[in-house]
């Protein structure tokens, strides 16, 4: 499959539904995020709970020495072309499963030891690595070749090293890594690597085909845009009552309660069911008072901030884009949620009865740290009043 023209430091390797991704970290990112305790390189990341944990540093190795490589990212595979020969191929065959194939080199996956809670052999060809820092277990098993786990000290840090390497005179090896909540159940056999890769490719192509046609000169850009959207989805889990589109699998690993509207608008014409899920994923957590959370991920619901009531405007636009959103059942559901959301602003953010609701923080407006809030709080923003008037007009 054709590689995408992207820098993995800016666009992560992932797939639709996955809670795993691989991201490049450069010197500046490591320096600006000392709390991550990471160093430059390619990191396998856990994207539960906002994607806050870089778990394994991935390095092609030969004779114990890390080798420079060139990453080539396509929707179905991340291929690391090793300087001097050899490849490491990585495929996310499922939401929590990474297939690994090495040829002419080995792969070292290094976890910072302070994140770990022990590593244990659980079979002739499988290891379990407990990572309290990510609140997850990692099971690594060999399909061909060998998997070994050891501890090592490099660059003044202690690591738990997992090595995937050819054995018995072979030049290639395959392994599988599973991220799980609790110990993973392993199948007796695994599908061939190329079969797993083909299934991912088919899933992406089906998603891409639903997108609007573009002129030939924009085809590569449209394919990249489709990949970014496709790979930003996470599967239902915990608070994620539906398949949801994150803002990014780089740094913004949540769904905020106005960004979800833009995701719904973007999908409305080409995939109305997915667009409906994006619109509703926030309203699934609406309180009895009518308030909705500021942001959600699979483990967190944040209610101490808000976002402005653009939801009526967004749903009206979605109806204009696709008649599917005017279906009676969807219209009734949207009306119920939007009515309660509108009334909440008047009941809880209009203490002086002026019918001019208030922002209590910059985050409530989406302007976050805008200088307009230097005057202090509360702020009766004309944009807020305008959004609410428009939402109530649409409801009427």
Regions found by a protein language model. Give the residues of each.
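The feature captures the catalytic groove of carbohydrate-active enzymes
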Residues: 160-189, 289, 294-310, 324-326, ...
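Extended, well-ordered alpha-helical scaffold segments
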Residues: 189-192, 196-199, 203, 217-224, ...
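Short, charged low-complexity intrinsically disordered segments located at boundaries
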Residues: 1, 86, 94, 253-261, ...
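A residue-identity detector for tryptophan
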Residues: 43, 127, 159, 190, ...
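Active-site-proximal flexible loops/turns
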Residues: 121-123, 266, 314, 390
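Substrate-binding groove/exosite segments of carbohydrate-active enzymes
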Residues: 208-320, 331, 339
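Terminal accessory carbohydrate-recognition/targeting modules of carbohydrate-active enzymes
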Residues: 1-217, 250
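Acidic surface patches and DE-rich sequence motifs
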Residues: 14, 235, 350
């Amino acid at each position: 499959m054709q590689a995408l023209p992207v820098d993995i430091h800016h666009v992560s390797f992932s797939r639709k539904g996955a809670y795993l991704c691989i991201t490049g970290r450069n010197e500046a990112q490591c320096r600006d995020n000392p709390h991550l305790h990471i160093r430059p390189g390619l990191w396998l990341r856990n994207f539960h709970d906002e994607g806050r944990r870089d778990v394994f540093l991935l390095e092609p190795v030969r004779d114990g020495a890390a080798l420079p490589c060139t990453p080539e990212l396509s929707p179905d595979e991340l291929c690391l072309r090793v300087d001097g020969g050899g490849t490491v191929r990585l495929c996310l065959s499922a939401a929590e499963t990474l297939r690994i194939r090495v040829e002419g080199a080995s792969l070292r996956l290094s976890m910072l030891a302070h994140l770990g809670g022990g590593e244990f052999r659980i079979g002739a060809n499988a290891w379990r690595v407990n990572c309290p820092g990510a609140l997850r277990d990692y099971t690594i098993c060999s399909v061909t070749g060998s998997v070994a786990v050891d501890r090592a000290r490099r660059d003044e840090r202690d690591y738990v090293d997992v090595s995937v390497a050819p054995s018995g005179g072979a030049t290639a090896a395959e392994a599988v890594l599973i991220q799980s909540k609790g110990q993973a159940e392993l199948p007796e056999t695994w599908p061939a690597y190329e079969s797993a890769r083909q299934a991912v490719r088919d899933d992406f192509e089906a998603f891409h085909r639903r997108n609007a046609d573009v002129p030939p000169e924009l085809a590569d850009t449209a394919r990249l845009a489709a990949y970014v959207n496709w790979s930003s989805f996470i599967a239902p889990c915990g608070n994620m009552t539906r398949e949801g589109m994150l803002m990014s699998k780089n740094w913004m690993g949540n769904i905020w309660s106005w960004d979800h509207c833009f995701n719904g608008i973007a999908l409305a014409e080409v995939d109305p069911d997915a667009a409906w899920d994006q619109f509703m994923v926030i309203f699934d957590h609406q309180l009895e008072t009518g308030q909705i959370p500021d942001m959600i991920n699979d483990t967190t619901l944040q209610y101490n901030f808000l976002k402005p009531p653009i939801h009526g405007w967004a749903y009206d636009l979605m109806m204009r884009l696709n008649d599917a959103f005017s279906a009676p059942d969807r219209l009734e559901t949207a009306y119920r949620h939007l009515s309660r959301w509108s009334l909440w602003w008047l009941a809880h953010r209009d203490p002086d009865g002026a019918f001019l609701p208030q922002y209590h923080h910059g985050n409530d407006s989406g302007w976050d740290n805008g200088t307009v809030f230097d005057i202090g709080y509360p702020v009766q923003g004309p944009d807020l009043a305008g959004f609410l008037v428009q939402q109530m007009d649409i409801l009427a």
